[in-house]
């Protein structure tokens, strides 16, 4: 099972999301997701989320919380432990991302975007400020 992080930055009623539209063979192609990626050797979840967020956006997280762990099980893909974060502050200048298009999406438009069905479950828990949680999702 691989370990990854995923972070959703929320500011002024909008969310910074990544539209995965640049790679043809991307399992997330055309989905709107948070910012994150795979752990590097000897990284903690905090190390990974800060590095991935900085690499993909140019922004440095300054306020964030660890929300939960989502276990993905699939007959089609390698299993994954995704460490989920919610951020409320950062510093720096947003830059282009080679993984897709970064965009600020108003909360009111968020639900209408193409997303994984499982994402809707953990995003609801995250937005409700649920205590630390663990989910298992099968695709």
What do the predicted segments below correspond to?
Residues 10-14, 23, 40, 89-93, ...:
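Short, charged/polar surface micro-motifs in flexible loops or helix N-caps
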Residues 15-51, 55:
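Conserved Nudix-box catalytic region and its N-terminal flanking loop in Nudix hydrolases
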Residues 39-62, 72-126:
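Unchanged
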Residues 125-139:
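Charged phosphate-binding loop/patch that engages nucleotide di/tri-phosphates or the phosphate backbone
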């Amino acid at each position: 099972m691989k370990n990854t992080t995923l972070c959703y930055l929320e500011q002024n009623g909008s969310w910074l999301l990544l539209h995965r539209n640049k790679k043809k063979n991307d399992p997330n192609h055309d989905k709107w997701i948070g910012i994150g990626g795979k752990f590097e050797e000897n990284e903690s979840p905090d190390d990974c989320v800060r590095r991935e967020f900085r690499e993909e956006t140019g922004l440095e997280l300054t306020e964030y919380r660890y929300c939960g762990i989502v276990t993905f099980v699939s007959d089609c893909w390698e299993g994954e432990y995704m460490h989920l974060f919610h951020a409320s502050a950062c510093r720096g200048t947003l830059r282009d991302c080679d993984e897709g298009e970064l965009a600020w999406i108003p909360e009111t438009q968020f639900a209408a975007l193409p997303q994984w069905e499982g994402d809707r479950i953990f995003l609801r828990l995250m937005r409700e400020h649920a205590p630390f949680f663990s989910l298992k999702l099968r695709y």
